[in-house]
Regions:
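N-terminal glycine-rich anion-binding loops that anchor highly charged ligand groups
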Residues: 41-59
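Catalytic or ion-translocation cores adjacent to nucleophile or general acid/base/metal-coordination motifs
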Residues: 115-132, 197-264
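Flexible, glycine/charged-enriched surface loops at secondary-structure junctions
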Residues: 120-124, 252-267, 310-329, 385-401, ...
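N-terminal amphipathic/basic leader segments beginning at the initiator methionine
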Residues: 2-36
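A conserved active-site cap/scaffold subdomain adjacent to cofactor or substrate pockets
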Residues: 234-334
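Gly-rich Lys/Arg/Thr-decorated short loops/hinges at beta-loop-alpha junctions or inter-strand turns
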Residues: 12-16, 53-69, 88, 132-160
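Active-site cavity-forming subdomains of large catalytic enzyme subunits
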Residues: 114-117, 122-187, 193
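C-terminal non-catalytic interaction/assembly regions of soluble proteins
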Residues: 338-539, 543
């Protein structure tokens, strides 16, 4: 697929950094925080990562129940609260994977919000192609195995139904959307750091250069670099590290920090900003006017978060070697990041999938007073004894307050000294048999009267719920990239003076005339006919249809 660019609209990088803010770290993060960051700081882009590993499987279930759902509804909350107006006023580009399992519906919501404030020229790009579930049988027939990362088991050997399957796309489609003038970009599953890398491919002129060279979106993005860029892989690595550092939102501006007592005013924690310079240098800072902090220790903790091998942090765009990264406190709330080394992009892309896993439920009781841990253990033994005939039922027990969060070797050493005043006894159960879960739910509350003394805190019987099991695997790039689509959605405004308006009016009247006799026989249809007829002296009419334009392939 070509990049389909007609002219360059690349911001000048020069000595001024590109400022990219993070609006949050997951679906469920503070919903209005992105608006606060937009108002307090001058950004070029706002990126928001809404998708955790299993979020898409949840969204897929929602979409099956309601074809218009399956996306991160928190996006609508802050857009409607003034976010769409602020994006327009400050000319900030929004790039987010809020589209989840249904990026088209999410994009239409965004367009509706823009239309409400009169932003009719707003261009919303939809990036799709990550959802491979509709093509699963074809992919299996053509050699894709979807072997589980940990067990190595092939999906065909498991036999369970795959409920969702999404490949992690890279930065190329995002850069393409920005090149054709998108104001807001809605994606499905895109690698977290690629949200930022796509912005930089556009702002640094790489995407425009790729168009000039006739490169396709499937070509390695390192090849998009202009001739004067001497170390494109290392630049990509720096951009990727920047995206990795801010994709978890406030986790790099003071949240979830080991030395939490040093962080001022957690109640008003501000979100992080990455400032990126033309030579690849990255500075991490934070929004103005609130609590939080950015220092070397905080950035270091986020740097090693979820990376696996620091010598090979794999993304669709580049493989990053982090071992030579240097972090320096430049000033208060500013950390300079340098030294990332890039290696060529991987041949495969990660797939986040979920398979049908039977049924599950969870419930808990509170045990308080002397020897709370001993009595909680007795409760657990009683429940297991009463359910021992259910051979397929798996029971997992946690004694919260009794050291359950400690590593096993430490818990064994301190278990004899633990004497918590209360313990939250929590069970999670699973089974392929729904009735097993129902039987479990009926045995929890009776322990208040039929177990040790001092047991309470029970609630309603938990209902059996369908269980999804995470299935991470790989897929070849050639099975994904040719199917990625970038579409541009805009509002179509029509007045009486336009030829399009006259065509629509004429076509509608012709249809109505053929149905006139039937419609007149039904009294309830007359107001509708009158409404659709359009009197010739009407004022300018506005039709807010959606016009879709697919990027040239």
């Amino acid at each position: 697929m070509g990049l389909a660019v007609r002219k360059s609209n690349v911001p000048a990088l020069a000595d001024e950094p590109i400022k990219i803010g993070s609006g949050g770290g997951f679906w469920g993060d503070r919903p209005l925080a992105p608006l606060d960051l937009l108002k307090s700081d001058d950004l070029d882009y706002l990126m928001i990562d809404y998708l955790a590993e299993l979020t898409l499987s949840i969204m897929t279930k929602q979409k099956r129940r309601d074809p218009s759902s399956g996306w991160a509804t928190d996006l609508e909350l802050w857009l409607a609260a003034g976010g769409i107006h602020t994006l327009r006023k400050k000319s900030v580009k929004l790039v987010t994977n809020a589209g989840g399992a249904n990026p088209e519906s999410c994009a239409r919501m965004v367009l509706e919000q823009a239309n409400k404030i009169g932003w009719h020229e707003c261009k919303v790009a939809v990036i799709s192609g990550d959802d491979i579930l509709p093509r699963l049988d074809y992919l299996l027939e053509n050699g894709e195995e979807f072997a589980h990362f940990e067990s190595g088991e092939k999906i065909s050997e498991n036999g369970a139904e795959m409920m969702s399957a999404n490949a992690y796309l890279g930065a190329g489609p995002i850069a393409s959307a920005l090149e054709i003038g998108a104001d807001i970009i809605i994606t499905g599953r895109v690698a977290d750091a690629s949200l930022l890398v796509g912005c930089m491919l556009h702002s640094a002129g790489w995407a425009h250069n790729a168009f000039q060279l006739g490169l396709t979106r499937e070509s390695p993005v390192a090849d998009w670099a202009p001739e004067n860029v001497r170390n494109p892989l290392d630049i990509l690595a720096q951009w990727t590290v920047a995206g990795h550092l801010i994709e978890c939102g406030a986790q790099v501006s003071g949240g979830n920090y080991s030395n939490w007592g040093d962080v001022p005013n957690l109640a008003t924690l501000t979100l992080p900003i990455a400032e990126i310079y033309s030579d690849g240098v990255v500075k991490i800072t934070r929004g103005q006017g609130g609590g939080g902090m950015v220092n070397r220790g905080i950035v270091a903790e986020q740097l090693i978060y979820e990376i696996g091998d620091p010598a090979a942090y794999i993304t669709p765009d580049v493989v990053v070697d982090m071992r030579n990264i240097t972090l320096e406190d430049e000033s208060e709330d500013v950390v300079v990041v340098t030294g990332a080394i890039g290696k060529p992009e991987p041949e495969s892309l990660k797939v986040s999938a979920a398979i049908e896993g039977g049924w599950f439920a969870a419930s808990s009781l509170l045990v308080s007073g002397p020897d709370a841990l001993g009595r909680a253990t007795a409760c657990d033994a009683a429940l297991r004894g009463r359910l021992s005939a259910l051979e397929e039922l798996e029971i997992y027990t946690e004694f919260i307050g009794g050291g359950v969060s400690l590593p096993e070797n430490i818990r064994q050493r301190v278990s004899s000294t633990l004497n918590p005043p209360e313990v939250l006894l929590r069970w999670a159960v699973s089974s392929t048999n729904k009735q097993d879960i129902t039987d479990f739910s009926r045995e929890v509350a009776p322990l208040v009267l039929t177990g040790p003394a001092g047991v309470g805190g029970y609630g309603a019987r938990p209902k059996p719920r369908r269980q999804l099991q995470f299935w991470p695997s790989l897929i070849s790039r050639k099975s994904i990239e040719p199917f990625v689509r970038v579409e541009l959605l805009t509002h179509l405004r029509i007045t009486q003076e336009s030829e399009r308006f006259h065509f629509i009016r004429k076509r509608t009247r012709n249809i109505l005339s053929r149905l006139q006799d039937e419609l007149d026989d039904r009294e309830w249809t007359r107001p509708i006919v009158k409404k659709l007829g359009w009197e010739s002296n009407d004022a300018d009419a506005e039709v807010t249809n959606l016009q879709e334009k697919e990027v040239e392939s």
